Amino acid sequence: MKPAMETAAEENTEQSQERKGCFECCIKCLGGVPYASLVATILCFSGVALFCGCGHVALAGTVAILEQHFSTNTSDHALLSEVIQLMQYVIYGIASFFFLYGIILLAEGFYTTSAVKELHGEFKTTACGRCISGMFVFLTYVLGVAWLGVFGFSAVPVFMFYNIWSTCEVIKSPQSNGTSGVEQICVDVRQYGIIPWNAFPGKICGSALENICNTNEFYMSYHLFIVACAGAGATVIALLIYMMATTYNYAVLKFKSREDCCPKF
């Protein structure tokens, strides 16, 4: 029989080796996490959620403001109402698509990172896998350009509401020349092209305009459009990160498929 001290030493050695094995396994697993894609996914989900949620509510508030104050005749803004309703349905589609696309890109990031870092033995990748990675690179570039347009488009209602808000601030300022001067300060939304020129009243002046700025619909819509624009900007940044990650991984996969080499992302 072995002495008790020798048996205890062997048990301690085995336990330390097990702990070391678990630690190395954890480090290896963490090494396979595509951190760039993970950050981009979180940023993409947050940006799309802000853009879609805030944009949907802000559009509904905009319609309410137009109907109550700038275009009392329903037929004058019927086309605008249909367009806004269509945009709200498009928002549902955008949210669903990017939720799925973000998950797919994250999964693709895990696949390419594991392949590049050779976590599961020697480097292995197929022509189909490289083709799929290339497809994601192209699609992400297209979506990035498209979201740049969405970001610019989302700034338009912010600009419009800012003009109305700044006009109201001028009306509230003590420099306004009495009641007659205030009533000459107006906002005409027809100049933005969202309602036709024959819409009535189309133009609001003075104290009536100030009352619009004090409504909850105006306050909420203005700030929600700002948040929606910020969400669109966050989505653009997320897609830029996706572009860099997918392009780098695809390039390394192509390179390592010809000659086993080192880098990783």
Swiss-Prot record:
GO molecular function: structural constituent of myelin sheath
InterPro entries from the UniProt entry: Myelin_PLP, Myelin_PLP_CS
Main location: membrane
Induction: By hypercapnic stimulation (CO2 inhalation) in ventral medullary surface neurons but not in the cerebral cortex.
Glycosylation sites: N73, N177
Membrane topology: Multi-pass membrane protein
Tissue-specific expression: Highly expressed in the ventral medullary surface, moderately in the cerebral cortex and cerebellum, poorly in lung and kidney, and not at all in heart, skeletal muscle, liver, stomach or stomach.
GO biological process, one term: negative regulation of serotonin uptake
Location relative to the cell: Membrane; Cell membrane
Lineage: superkingdom: Eukaryota
Residues found modified as Phosphoserine: S257
GO CC annotations on file: membrane raft; myelin sheath; plasma membrane
Keywords assigned by UniProt, alphabetized: Cell membrane, Developmental protein, Differentiation, Glycoprotein, Membrane, Neurogenesis, Osteogenesis, Phosphoprotein, Protein transport, Transmembrane, Transmembrane helix, Transport
Transmembrane segments: 31-51, 90-110, 136-156, 224-244
Record-stated family: Belongs to the myelin proteolipid protein family.
Described function: May be involved in neural development. Involved in regulation of osteoblast function and bone formation. Involved in matrix vesicle release by osteoblasts; this function seems to involve maintenance of the actin cytoskeleton. May be involved in cellular trafficking of SERT and thereby in regulation of serotonin uptake.
Subunit architecture: Interacts with SERT.
UniProt protein name: Neuronal membrane glycoprotein M6-b
Species name: Rattus norvegicus
Lineage: Eukaryota, Metazoa, Chordata, Craniata, Vertebrata
